[in-house]
C-alpha cells in the first residue's frame, strides 16, 4: 500500500463515533447547552445521559463554520480540518479528566466548536490547539454539571 491510500487503516484519526450526529441531539445542544467564548471559537457544551446509539462514547463533538463568516467552501473545509486535528491532539485533557469507564459512566459530554472569526487570516494549527486546550481546561475547571453523587465529572 502506498502511504495515504484510503484503504490504509488510520489509527490517529478522530473516530466516527465521536462526531456528534442527529438533528435532535444537536438542536438540544444548541438550545440548552452552556457557552464558552474564546478568541475565535465558541464552545457550546452539555452533559447528559448517553444516547442509545453510542452509550460507551464519553464525548461527542461537532465542528461548524458559518457560511456568512467564511463564504468560500475551501476555507470552511480547511478551518474544520484544523479544528478537528487540534481537538484530536488536545482531547486527552478531557478524556483523562472524565476518567470514563463504560460500565459506570452515566454521562456523555457533547461539545460544539463554532468558528467565529472572518476568513481573512485563517489561524494556524498551533493557535487552534492553544485555543481548544484553553477552552477544555476552562470547561473542566468550573463548567461541567454535578453528577448524581455530587462529584464533579472529572
Curated annotation (Swiss-Prot):
It comes from Chlorobaculum tepidum (strain ATCC 49652 / DSM 12025 / NBRC 103806 / TLS). It catalyses: Endonucleolytic cleavage of RNA, removing 5'-extranucleotides from tRNA precursor. Keywords: Endonuclease, Hydrolase, Nuclease, RNA-binding, tRNA processing. This is Ribonuclease P protein component. One of its GO terms (biological process) is tRNA 5'-leader removal. Consists of a catalytic RNA component (M1 or rnpB) and a protein subunit. InterPro entries: Ribosomal_Su5_D2-typ_SF, Ribsml_uS5_D2-typ_fold_subgr, RNase_P, RNase_P_CS. HAMAP family: RNase_P.
Amino acid at each position: 500500500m502506498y502511504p495515504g491510500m484510503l484503504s490504509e487503516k488510520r489509527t490517529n484519526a478522530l473516530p466516527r463515533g465521536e462526531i456528534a450526529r442527529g438533528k435532535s441531539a444537536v438542536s438540544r445542544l444548541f438550545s440548552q447547552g452552556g457557552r464558552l467564548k474564546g478568541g475565535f471559537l465558541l464552545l457550546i457544551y452539555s452533559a447528559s445521559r448517553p444516547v442509545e446509539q453510542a452509550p460507551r462514547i464519553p464525548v461527542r463533538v461537532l465542528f461548524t463554520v458559518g457560511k456568512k463568516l467564511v463564504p468560500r467552501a475551501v476555507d470552511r473545509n480547511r478551518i474544520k480540518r484544523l479544528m478537528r486535528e487540534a481537538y484530536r491532539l488536545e482531547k486527552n485533557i478531557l478524556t483523562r479528566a472524565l476518567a470514563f469507564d463504560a460500565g459506570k459512566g452515566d454521562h456523555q459530554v457533547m461539545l460544539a466548536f463554532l468558528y467565529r472569526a472572518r476568513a481573512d487570516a485563517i489561524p494556524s494549527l498551533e493557535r487552534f490547539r492553544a485555543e481548544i486546550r484553553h477552552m477544555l481546561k476552562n470547561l473542566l475547571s468550573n463548567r461541567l454539571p454535578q453528577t448524581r453523587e455530587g462529584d464533579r465529572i472529572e
